[in-house]
């Protein structure tokens, strides 16, 4: 088959129009290649993705890299297929970009197989109907806002409250306890953080269980709007071909929408509410519907969500919320108390905190813990004004238990061992339930609250109490 060439007819920022001979238009989502000497000296080094057909012989495309240095009349080669990325075990421990090229200077990936980045979501028949909890080994998550296998979790938090450390601990726990793989999509975030994550994962020994796909802030919007799809294709391979339970991290899902809105106007679409693209819900749905459990395996995704100007009604976060099964909210107030992970136990929610999914016992204890913490929160104003002495005996007991619960919700992480000096703990769900049940029931009212800080199970807290008393 002869190669199909077109010519660049106009360049507007990240959007490029290419003219082809009549009857030779490449289909939507096809990848075209152009030589851009401003990137490097390789031939056909710039990938364009067909987005629209304009009339009979012209297509409008989105560039996946810089368009500086392109000129009209340049040749564009139709590759005959969509953007595809290498998949399989060879991608583990590597950093790829949106078009599947390695950017870690460790040579080619040499994967046996490639997947296109636009794929159909699993059909109804293939989807798993079982709702089950996904144990993370992190007490506060497993007890109060459990993750569903194949579910989508929103991770909310400002700068410096521990989002990245929590993500790394989850990668570590799924690798060591479940033997599973993780895929990390860095979408429009800081390159420095992407670099730090790679270094830290290397140090903590989890890098060989994860594939990293980056399209960071400095990339053109085309790359940022597609990099989450590239990562998702890698995760889908592990789910569909290897039957794995994969963790997919997207940091940050807001940037995916933001990139879409940047190219939307250039593509000639009329903007919708707050200037976002009119196709916002469709684009989000196409991405999110591919993240699910099938009869073969599952993809559970944790998505960091930036909320612009703290406005939860902004169309971008509001569209993402519709897809979430659980939320993990990190709070600065809790981080200031030195309690890590700084998850807010009253603000975090989960769809599967339901006795029919997690069982009566777990549900009852989770609700009791929330009740005690909420009561303590309500009493804090009184304590601040009048002091502890003015409380009734019953309220004093609630406060004492709440403070123990608060401290027992902290735990040392494996990936932070180098900083904390205490070995990380993976806590089994039954131990988590047992520990909180005993605190709520008042079995440990005589033990000082500092014994509960930064331990794994309740037995460790009792050991620590003995050491403190000695």
UniProtKB/Swiss-Prot annotation:
Record keywords: ATP synthesis, ATP-binding, Cell inner membrane, Cell membrane, CF(1), Hydrogen ion transport, Ion transport, Membrane, Nucleotide-binding, Translocase, Transport
UniProt cross-references to Pfam families, sorted A to Z: ATP-synt_ab, ATP-synt_ab_N, ATP-synt_VA_C
Name by which UniProt lists this protein: ATP synthase subunit beta
EC number: 7.1.2.2
GO molecular function term, any single one: ATP hydrolysis activity
Source species of the chain: Geobacter metallireducens (strain ATCC 53774 / DSM 7210 / GS-15)
Binding site for ATP: 157-164
Record's GO cellular component terms: plasma membrane; proton-transporting ATP synthase complex
InterPro entries per UniProt: AAA+_ATPase, ATP-synt_VA_C, ATP_synth_F1_bsu, ATPase_a/bsu_AS, ATPase_alpha/beta_chains, ATPase_F1/V1/A1_a/bsu_N, ATPase_F1/V1/A1_a/bsu_N_sf, ATPase_F1/V1/A1_a/bsu_nucl-bd
Protein's membrane topology: Peripheral membrane protein
Subcellular location: Cell inner membrane
Transmembrane segment boundaries: none
Chief localization: membrane
Gene: atpD
Function: Produces ATP from ADP in the presence of a proton gradient across the membrane. The catalytic sites are hosted primarily by the beta subunits.
Subunit structure: F-type ATPases have 2 components, CF(1) - the catalytic core - and CF(0) - the membrane proton channel. CF(1) has five subunits: alpha(3), beta(3), gamma(1), delta(1), epsilon(1). CF(0) has three main subunits: a(1), b(2) and c(9-12). The alpha and beta chains form an alternating ring which encloses part of the gamma chain. CF(1) is attached to CF(0) by a central stalk formed by the gamma and epsilon chains, while a peripheral stalk is formed by the delta and b chains.
Catalysed reactions, as listed in the record: ATP + H2O + 4 H(+)(in) = ADP + phosphate + 5 H(+)(out)
Keyword hit for Cell inner membrane: yes
